[in-house]
Amino acid sequence: MQICQTKLNFTFPNPTNPNFCKPKALQWSPPRRISLLPCRGFSSDEFPVDETFLEKFGPKDKDTEDEARRRNWIERGWAPWEEILTPEADFARKSLNEGEEVPLQSPEAIEAFKMLRPSYRKKKIKEMGITEDEWYAKQFEIRGDKPPPLETSWAGPMVLRQIPPRDWPPRGWEVDRKELEFIREAHKLMAERVWLEDLDKDLRVGEDATVDKMCLERFKVFLKQYKEWVEDNKDRLEEESYKLDQDFYPGRRKRGKDYEDGMYELPFYYPGMVCEGTVTTLHLYQGAFVDIGGVHEGWVPIKGNDWFWIRHFIKVGMHVIVEITAKRDPYRFRFPLELRFVHPNIDHMIFNKFDFPPIFHRDGDTNPDEIRRDCGRPPEPRKDPGSKPEEEGLLSDHPYVDKLWQIHVAEQMILGDYEANPAKYEGKKLSELSDDEDFDEQKDIEYGEAYYKKTKLPKVILKTSVKELDLEAALTERQHHNKLMMEAKARGEGYKIDKLRRNIEMDEYDFLHWRRSLEEREALLRDISSRQALGLPLEEPGRYKPGSFFGKDQYDPTSALYQYDYWGEPKNSEISKQERMKDAHNKSIVGKGNVWYDMSYDDAIKQTIEKRKEGSTLASQEEETESEEEEEDDDDFDDFDYSILSDESSIGYSEQQPLVNGTQVLTD
C-alpha cells in the first residue's frame, strides 16, 4: 500500500562495516525540509536522554551493584562465591547501571562489551600468552581468600574398642540367649576407661586384664551371629532395594556390580561408632558422603554457604575419620547413616543445620500425623477448633447400617417380584439366583437423572449383588407374617408388622456403636482427669495454636468466604427462587411492598394498569420530542435511555432483575 506519494531518500548504515555494533556517540545531521503530503502514521516514542532526565529518573541507590548483590545474597542465605559468567552475562552484569540509548561510561562495561566479539577474545588470550583451553580453565579457579590449613588437635591418644551394637539382634531374628547375654556384658564394661599405657604394658608382660576390657571375645561372638543374619537376609534386602529405589544415588544401598562381599549391613553399626572412610561425593544442598565399608554410605549434613570454607578442607577421595551420630530406618529416611567428621574436625564451620533429616513419601502414606510421629518431627501447628470431644454427643449411627438397609431393600424388592410374578421363578430356588451381569464393587453406584411430577431430579442407583442377600430367610419371614396376617383377618382383627429381621439387626448395630462411643467417652474422661492430676498437657504440645498465631486473612476451608467468591454464597435454592419471584410480582403490582395496607388489591391492580397506560403515552411523546431534537442538534446524550429512571412499578418479573454472581438481585 502506497502511503506517501512523494519520493524520499533515506540513508541506512552500511551493513558491510563489521564495527556497526560498537556504541558510538549519537550524531545528528542538520534537518532537511521536505514537503510531504499529509499522511496518517505513528511517531516514535524514543528520544535522546538528557542529563536532567537521568538525574530525575536514574537509579538513586547509593549502594553499588556489587554491594547490593552481596546484601541480597546474604539475606537469601546462599551466594555464588565465584561467578562463572559467559561474555554476554558478564556484559549484562557490568552494564546494569548504564543508561539506555546512551554511550557506555564505565571502563569495565566498555571492556565487557568488547569481549563479546570472538576476535577480540582471541586477541586478549594471545596477549596473555596462554591457550584457549587454559583461559577457560582459569575462569573456574577459586579466586576468593584461601584459609590456612586446618589442624585437628587431640587431647591425647584415643583407644577405640569393638563394641557390639545395643540394638542387636534385629527385629524378628532369634539368637541364642546365653550368647546374647555374653555379648551384652560388653556394654557394662564401657564405663571402664582403657588407657594406652596400660594396654602396652599388659601386651609386653603378657597379662590379659586390660585386653579383656577391650571386649574382643564378645565382639567375635557378635560377628558370628551377624554373619548368619547376613547370609539369610542379603538377597531379601537387595530385592527390596530394587523395589523401593528405582535409581541408585549416594546414601542408598549398593547393589548389583557395586555390591561386594564383606560389606557391612546396617545392624553392624551403632551411634557413637568411630570409623575410617573415604569421601566419595560432595553435594551443595545435601552434604558430603563417606564410604565406611558398608552397603550404605554415610551422610554428613552440610549445605549452603558453609561450603565456602569447608570446600578447602573436604575434597573427594581424601581419607577421613568419622563418627556415626544416628542410625535410622532405611525405608523411611533417605540417608540411614548420619556422620560427623572427627579428622579433620569441621564442626566449628557448620552453621546451617538441617531442620530434619530428609525422608521418603511412599504411596501408602495417607496420614501425615503418623508420618510425622514416625520420623520424630514436631506437629504442624493448626488452628484450635475450640471443640471439646468430652462434651459432644454420643454416636449411635453405625457405618454398616446403610449397607444393611440397602441389602434389606433389595431383598424386599426381589420378594415383591417373586409374589407378583410366580411363573418367572417357577422351578428355581432363591438361593440359586445369580447376577445378570458381572458385579463390580468399584461401579456399584450409578448417578443419573429422572422426572418426578414434571420435575427433573438427580437419581442414584445402588447395585447389590445377589450373593450378599439372604433370600431364603427373608422369604420364610414374609411367609410367616403373611400367615399371621391371614389368621388375624379371619378373626376380624388387624395385623401390623412391628420390625423385620433386618430392622432388628440394624438396631443391634446402632446399639453396639452407641455402647462403644460411651466406653470411649468414659476412657477419655479418665485420661483427662489423670493428666490434670499429674500436670500433663491435655493435647500434644504444639498441635493447636490460637487464631492470633496465624495472623489475619488466613485461608479457612470451613468459611464460606473461601468457598465462593467475594459476593458470598449464591441463593439458588428453590425456596429462595420462589421468594424472589413473589417479591418481583408484588413490586410489579404495587411498586413497593409497604403500601399494601394503603389500598385494596383491586385498587392496586387498577392503579398499575393506569400507570402503564400513562407510561406508554409518555414514551410516545418522548420519541417525538427526541426526533425533533435530533434534527436540530446531533448530540451524543440523546441516545440515553431514560426509561430506566421510571417508577419502580415498571420493574417486571424475575426475568427483568439484574444478575449479580449468577443470582437475581432485587432492587428496592
Swiss-Prot record:
Which residue intervals are annotated with compositional bias (Acidic residues) in the record?
621-641
Report the locations given in the UniProt record: Plastid, Chloroplast
Keywords in alphabetical order: Chloroplast, Phosphoprotein, Plastid, Transit peptide
UniProt-annotated stretches for the region Disordered? 362-394, 611-668
Q: Which residues carry this modification: Phosphoserine?
A: S434
Tell me where in this chain the S1 motif domain is found: 272-340
Q: Where are the transmembrane segments?
A: none
* Keyword Transit peptide assigned: yes
Query: Which positions form the organelle transit peptide?
Result: 1-40
Which intervals of the chain form a coiled coil?
Answer: none
In this chain, composition skew of type Basic and acidic residues spans 362-391
- Quote the biased-composition stretches of kind Polar residues, using this chain's numbering: 646-668
Record-level GO cellular component terms: chloroplast; chloroplast nucleoid; chloroplast stroma; plastid-encoded plastid RNA polymerase complex
MF terms in GO: RNA binding
Q: Keyword Nucleotidyltransferase, does the record have it?
A: no
Q: Which InterPro entries match?
A: NA-bd_OB-fold (IPR012340), PTAC10 (IPR044967), S1_domain (IPR003029)
Q: How does it assemble?
A: Component of the transcriptionally active chromosome (TAC) complexes. Interacts with PTAC7.
Its protein name is Protein PLASTID TRANSCRIPTIONALLY ACTIVE 10
